[in-house]
């Protein structure tokens, strides 16, 4: 049936597209529902493109570290789209003792998980980035963090997922989710009812409303 799939993903941003791509690579039948008229037109087109491990909850780090090492370096080649990914490191800046305490806590927890991150003083911060003012007294420094272009990366996930058979449907704003025998299976829009064994909500700032 046209409105059924193994997995329905709500949200056509970079997260929804990435989930769709990796599921489709494993042969999963996927539908992506996007409430707007364009794929990647929400938060995925309005961010700095940070690809970072530092500053995260330690529970996220094993997955993020795996992605940095094994997934991001080959994406442009896989997609035949330049994601503009590069690893120039990430500074998380502090101006006072309170900031330093927070950064030290984040750094300590990340090091325990195995991340290459350390605290540096203001002088070393300015050796890395001479344009920063003397107000910056400390920072955490993670040399394997980086950046990518969120627009081209989302496009790459989208184009490649489509080639793998993912069905993308725009203009389908989800208004209700329904359970069948205790399991979330139905996704309702003003125009259609979709059904899947698994439903993933990846709608960014609109996820709470859904």
How would you describe each model-predicted region?
Residues 2-15, 31:
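Beta1/beta-strand and adjacent pyrophosphate-binding region of the FAD-binding site
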Residues 15, 38, 206:
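Conserved Rossmann-like nucleotide-cofactor binding loop
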Residues 20, 24, 160:
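Gly/Ala-rich phosphate-binding loop of Rossmann-like dinucleotide-binding domains
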Residues 24-44:
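Glycine-rich FAD pyrophosphate-binding loop
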Residues 26, 113, 164:
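Conserved dinucleotide-binding and phosphotransfer motif residues
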Residues 30, 117, 199:
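Hydrophobic anchor at the start of a short beta-strand
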Residues 48-128:
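Dinucleotide-binding Rossmann-like beta1-alpha1 core, especially the glycine-rich loop
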Residues 140-198, 202-206:
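Helical element adjacent to the flavin cofactor pocket in flavoenzyme catalytic cores
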């Amino acid at each position: 049936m046209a409105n059924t799939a193994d997995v329905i993903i709500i949200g056509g941003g970079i997260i929804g597209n990435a989930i769709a791509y990796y599921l489709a690579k494993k042969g999963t039948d996927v539908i992506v529902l996007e409430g707007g008229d364009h794929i990647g037109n929400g938060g995925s087109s309005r961010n700095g493109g940070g690809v970072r491990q530092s500053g995260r909850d330690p529970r996220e780090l094993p997955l993020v570290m795996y992605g940095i090492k094994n997934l991001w370096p080959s994406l442009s080649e896989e997609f035949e789209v330049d994601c503009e990914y590069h690893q120039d490191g990430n500074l998380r800046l502090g101006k006072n003792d309170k900031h330093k305490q927070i950064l030290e806590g984040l750094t300590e927890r990340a090091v325990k998980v195995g991340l290459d991150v350390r605290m540096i003083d203001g002088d070393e911060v300015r050796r890395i980035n001479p344009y920063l003012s003397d107000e910056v007294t400390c920072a955490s420094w993670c040399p394997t963090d980086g950046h990518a272009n969120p627009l081209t990366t989302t496009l790459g996930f989208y184009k490649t997922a489509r080639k793998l058979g993912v069905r993308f449907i725009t203009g389908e704003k989800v208004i209700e989710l329904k359970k069948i025998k205790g399991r979330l299976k139905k996704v309702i829009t003003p125009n259609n009812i979709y059904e899947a064994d698994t439903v993933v909500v990846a709608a960014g700032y609109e996820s709470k409303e859904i």
